[in-house]
Swiss-Prot record:
Biological processes per GO annotation: mitochondrial respirasome assembly
Name used for this protein in its record: Respiratory supercomplex factor 1, mitochondrial
Keywords: Coiled coil, Membrane, Mitochondrion, Transmembrane, Transmembrane helix
Location of this chain's protein in the cell: Mitochondrion membrane
Domain HIG1, residue spans: 13-104
Pfam families attached to this UniProt entry: HIG_1_N (PF04588)
Region spans: Disordered: 139-220
Gene Ontology annotations for the cellular component aspect, listed alphabetically: mitochondrial membrane
Main location: mitochondrion
Subunit details: Associates with the respiratory chain complex III/complex IV supercomplex.
Length: 220
């Protein structure tokens, strides 16, 4: 990015205007008085022209044509003198006017460059603030996600511990009572009881049938 001193003030300026801050910030009235001091013949010629015109107007009212003509000639001479003074002053101060125009242009360029630099700095500051705000939002979001993941992983473990604690309190845990999955232990006990029962008692023989019949007859 070009610097103000390199791009705007890099060109050589006239030595008479070095460090001349009053010239850069000159007020309108100060400029008028400066022009009057630099070219005093122009206002002098303008004053003589006005004076000759007024002096010609009075003889005209009185009807003195000779005096009026003299004043008109004097007015024309004063006006010509003013024009010559303007031309001579323009030729004499041409270099200074060019320098003044150049300095005015440099001042405008410097002001515009300063405004652009301020605008760029403001944009950079806003960009940094935006980046910092986005970083804070991302950090908060990451912390919230980490906390949420930690709570989700801690909840199943706590549920398992609570369940095992209740089973131990009731004495129904798998290690103490031999219970495994629901429905497995009763089936195993029933099959074991059936296997332990004698086969003879389960089968009714003819002898047993006769014995039962005899006992029934006695009873009757």
């Amino acid at each position: 990015m070009p610097n103000v001193d390199d791009s705007v003030m890099g060109r050589q300026m006239p030595s008479s205007f070095d460090e001349n801050h009053e010239f850069y910030n000159e007020k309108p009235m100060a400029k008028i008085f400066r022009k009057l001091r630099e070219e005093p013949l122009i206002p002098l010629g303008a004053g003589l022209t006005v004076f000759a015109f007024t002096q010609a107007w009075r003889p005209m009212r009185r009807g003195d044509q000779v005096s009026a003509n003299k004043m008109f000639r004097a007015r024309v001479a004063a006006q010509g003198f003013t024009v010559l003074a303007m031309i001579a002053g323009s030729m004499y101060y041409n270099k200074d006017r060019e320098a003044t125009k150049e300095l005015r242009k440099l001042k405008e360029e410097r002001d515009s460059e300063e405004k652009r630099q301020k605008w760029i700095r403001e944009l950079e500051i806003r960009d940094e603030e935006d980046k910092a705000m986005r970083a804070r939002v991302m950090n908060r979001r990451a912390k919230a996600e980490e906390a949420k993941a930690g709570n989700a992983s801690a909840t199943p473990a706590e549920g398992g511990e609570a369940k095992s604690g209740v089973l131990n309190a009731l004495g129904l845990s798998g290690s103490s009572s031999g219970w495994g999955k629901p429905g497995e232990a009763p089936l195993a006990d029933a099959s074991k009881a059936v296997d332990d029962e004698p086969i003879v008692s389960k089968v009714k023989t003819p002898t047993n049938v006769k014995r039962v019949s005899a006992e029934d007859d006695k009873t009757n």
